[in-house]
């Protein structure tokens, strides 16, 4: 979807991502090579992003250029900027909110000619069709196609373009939606939290706009849980919610509308309750296969990495639901900001082999169930595995061998012991700190020693497979921070 940006904006976004992700100096020539453009273009882009993002701190020197993160700046604001200043995305948003308007009103809103509008729409449709099954038409102005794709795309768009606390939906205030969702949580005992609550509000308000313009999803009778819908419509307190929707939104919250709002959660392969899922895993052949495949993966990973997965069935339940909510919950695919992909990448930097094996397992699971094993779907399932496995990170860290650290001083043994004791207190328990106890010291002795990290206040020549820290260069606080960071850099990987 980044191709909906202009070529210049696309390149500037990639430039900022490079500078944010890599905390180092870049020469202009290197950036030009990475971005496949001229050095002149890089210089122009740097000038533009500096003026566009005054809160970002750029450092320039003979070493090149780098960006310095501050406490109140984050790459998230970069994506908001490019969404906001993109004509293509702005036109898409305008059409979503104003479906049924005439093409002239779009031209007047964006100060463009009719021919320019038609050219832009052709380009938008060309890009969208590469990934989604819907298109924009201008006679009349409508968004038509696969309703799941339409609803997902725009809900994801709103989640990426607007900040967490923003609510850009003038036609639908938040309160009735929140009341409906709180009613659902109570009626179904569905586990809820802040981020999931916001996600559901965005999905529901997107659905409301589509319903407002007369677009309903086709639901296969065999895949829809009518029994759950019926019990929901008869739950105590539903009449007050219906009245609220009627007075605030002028929408009749009947059975059909409720079904359209929560269509993803009334499908038979989604289970609101964990116990219901586990019971179906005993009687339904498809659910049983899904449970067994995921269970085999969890058990395999647990054995290989010596993990104690206390919430095995709960994890399998979440993974099954995640697999069957593709494009029906946010961040299963991204438009500009691959936030979950970045989260997985950060985790993979620490545990590369573990993440790779989980990804392979998820790909096998999807293929075995005849589901599309796209990289985005695999990533989303991997994210769910990592975040929903109880104490996973703690167990992986505890199971890693401790790094052996040698502390030496040319002052005396007491200084070395003092440094070692300080580091032992403030650093994690993933280190074994010792001081040199022999009378003689040689480079060969250090090479043959079992230590992974050597800290000294005197210079030692580089040693292969040893990390050397010259303590005169850093204060104690920086030394603690540096050593803690090193536990994530395994010497054998």
Language-model features, listed with the residues they occupy:
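A cross-family "folded-core" feature that marks the main globular domain of proteins
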Residues: 1-493
């Amino acid at each position: 979807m980044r191709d909906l940006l202009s070529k210049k904006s696309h390149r500037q976004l990639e430039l900022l991502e490079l500078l944010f992700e890599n905390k180092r100096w870049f020469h202009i020539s290197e950036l030009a090579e990475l971005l496949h453009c001229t050095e002149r273009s890089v210089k122009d882009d740097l000038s533009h992003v500096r003026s566009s993002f005054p809160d970002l701190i750029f450092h320039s020197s003979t070493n090149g250029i780098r960006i310095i993160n501050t406490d109140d700046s984050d790459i998230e604001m970069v994506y908001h900027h490019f969404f906001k200043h993109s004509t293509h995305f702005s036109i898409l948003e305008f059409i979503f909110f104003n479906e049924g308007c005439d093409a002239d009103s779009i031209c007047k809103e964006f100060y463009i000619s009719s021919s320019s509008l038609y050219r832009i729409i052709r380009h938008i449709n060309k890009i969208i069709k590469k990934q989604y099954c819907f298109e924009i038409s201008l006679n009349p102005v409508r968004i038509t196609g696969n309703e799941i794709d339409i609803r997902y795309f725009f809900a994801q768009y709103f989640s990426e373009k607007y900040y967490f606390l923003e609510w850009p939906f003038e036609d639908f205030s938040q309160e009735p939606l929140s009341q409906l969702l709180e009613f659902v949580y109570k009626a179904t005992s569905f586990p809820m939290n802040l981020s999931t609550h916001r996600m559901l509000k965005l999905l529901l308000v997107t659905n409301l706009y589509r319903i407002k313009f007369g677009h309903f999803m086709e639901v296969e009778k065999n895949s829809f849980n009518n029994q759950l819908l019926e019990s929901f419509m008869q739950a105590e307190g539903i009449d007050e919610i219906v009245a609220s929707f009627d007075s605030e939104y002028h929408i009749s919250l009947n059975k059909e509308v409720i079904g359209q709002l929560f269509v993803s959660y009334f499908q038979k392969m989604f289970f609101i309750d964990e116990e219901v899922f586990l019971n179906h895993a005993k009687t339904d052949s498809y659910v049983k296969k899904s449970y067994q495949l995921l269970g085999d993966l969890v058990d395999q990973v647990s054995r290989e990495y010596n993990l104690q997965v206390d919430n095995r069935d709960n994890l399998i339940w979440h993974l099954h639901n995640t697999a069957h909510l593709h494009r029906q919950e946010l961040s299963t695919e991204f438009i500009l900001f691959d936030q979950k992909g970045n989260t997985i990448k950060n985790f993979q930097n620490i545990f590369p082999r573990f993440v790779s094996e989980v990804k392979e397992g998820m790909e096998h699971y999807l293929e075995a169930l005849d589901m599309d094993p796209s990289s985005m779907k695999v990533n989303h399932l991997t994210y769910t595995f990592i975040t929903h496995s109880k104490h996973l990170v703690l167990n992986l860290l505890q199971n890693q061998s401790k790094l052996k650290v040698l502390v030496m001083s040319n002052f005396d043994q007491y200084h070395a012991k003092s440094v070692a004791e300080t580091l032992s207190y403030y650093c994690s328990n993933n280190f074994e700190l010792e001081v040199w106890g022999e009378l003689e010291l040689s480079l060969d002795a250090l090479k043959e020693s079992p230590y992974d990290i050597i800290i000294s206040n005197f210079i030692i020549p580089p040693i292969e497979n040893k990390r050397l820290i010259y303590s005169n260069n850093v204060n104690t606080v920086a030394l603690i921070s540096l050593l803690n960071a090193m536990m994530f850099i395994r010497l054998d990987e």
